[in-house]
Amino acid sequence: MAISDGHGLPLAVHVASASPHETKLVEPTLQQRFLAEAPERLIGDRAYDSDPLDVQLRERFGVQLVAPHKCTRSKAPTQDGRVLRRYRRRWKIERLFAWLHNFRRVVIRWEYYPENFLGMVQLACAVILLRYL
């Protein structure tokens, strides 16, 4: 899982197995961020439509979660259209993943230990940041 800024540059990366749901990985990813301060808002897809996650991010990190509601949502909507305008900027995180796919060791996980793979992902993020400077 990765978190990027408004330019698509990496702010945090976290490596986990493929089995946990993405909402379970948000907090560990925010704890492993490269900067001291947390981002103002997180923009996610419909999988992040979770009221407990929204409250948890707001209370622990002061982060606003922007995610469109699922079509099967039974509770009342918590976001209006003004907040969801920021969802259009979600392509920037997809650009970060495209940049990460330029590194062969990151595309397919060949490493047995997750620490080694995390090191490769962090090295790729460092190269991306150096290219931006």
Description of each model-found segment:
Residues M1-P10, S19, V26:
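Short conserved beta-strand segments at catalytic cores or DNA/RNA-binding microdomains
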Residues M120-L133:
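Charged phosphate-binding loop/patch that engages nucleotide di/tri-phosphates or the phosphate backbone
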Residues G8, E94, L123:
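A residue-level signal for conserved active-site and pocket-lining positions in enzyme catalytic cores
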Residues P10-V13, I108:
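Short small-residue beta-strand/loop micro-motif enriched in glycine and branched aliphatics
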Residues S19, E37-Y113:
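Helix-centered, glycine/charged polyanion-binding patches within enzymatic domains
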Residues H14-A36, R41:
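Active-site beta-loop-alpha junctions of metal-dependent nucleic acid enzymes
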Residues M1, A12, F97-A98, L118-Q122:
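Conserved, well-structured core segments
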Residues I3-S4, H14, K92:
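Well-ordered beta-strand positions
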